[in-house]
Amino acid sequence: MRSDHPTLLTAIRPTTFIESAKLRDHLGLDITIATETFQHTGSFKFRAAYNLALNVEQDEVLTASSGNFGQALAYACKLTGKKCTVVMPSTSARVKIDAVRGYGATVDLVDTTKVGRNERVDRKSVV
């Protein structure tokens, strides 16, 4: 692990917990909901992505994603100074593609009717 970057615990935002009176009344159970919508990139996936970017030895990271993990990894790589390529289906939502690019990653769009995302990642990883 590189010591010049924040640890996972200092990089993530705290999880917000919400008690649901409505569910308690309906189900007769105390229900607490953990929400990760305030996490970087709006998803719990930033936790895994940052941990990966922080601990992988390579300077470039390659993944397949339809959006959320790709965004999280792109942002994590930006924070850790690594290059990131995200293989995404060409049918991915434009907002997801733009978000991945906005975090500085290269987006490789693939027609998944002709080749799978993981197959494309495998091909790119041997180059």
Task: Explain the meaning of each model-derived region.
Residues M1-V127:
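PLP-dependent amino-acid enzyme catalytic core
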